Amino acid sequence: MGAQSHSLEITSSVSAEKIFSGIVLDVDTVIPKAAPGAYKSVEVKGDGGAGTVRIITLPEGSPITSMTVRTDAVNKEALTYDSTVIDGDILLGFIESIETHLVVVPTADGGSITKTTAIFHTKGDAVVPEENIKFADAQNTALFKAIEAYLIAN
């Protein structure tokens, strides 16, 4: 099994605690309000903490239709969240799993930087194409910005 790592940082004017709540702790209630068309459905099995599984179905017309995400760890004090995509067509047939490590860091101006590292565990020596990574970055950034706008407005 191969491993390929990719990092993404997004700066926000919203405080670290509020962003962490919006993208991690309250994500199941925030996304339907902030980005109503982002998900067709989300089935949550668990209480949101470690071991929780979310079965996510994406809307018609999306190049990806499903993903199952397991929460591995949530630390509310350190503002960290670890999860793993364990199933769904998002794995593209050549990825075993996608491990994600997220940390939200406060900035001196009262805003925050969200740092995400994704580790793609691939089958054999497969490599995730750069265009797939760029597409994922664009989708994740758009969803983040929708949540950020919602948090600013509310």
UniProtKB/Swiss-Prot annotation:
Gene Ontology terms for molecular function: abscisic acid binding; protein phosphatase inhibitor activity; signaling receptor activity
Pfam families, per the entry: Bet_v_1 (PF00407)
Keyword NADP: no
Name of this protein: Major allergen Dau c 1
Organism: Daucus carota (Wild carrot)
Family, as annotated: Belongs to the BetVI family.
Subunit structure, as described in the record: Homodimer.
Domain of life: Eukaryota
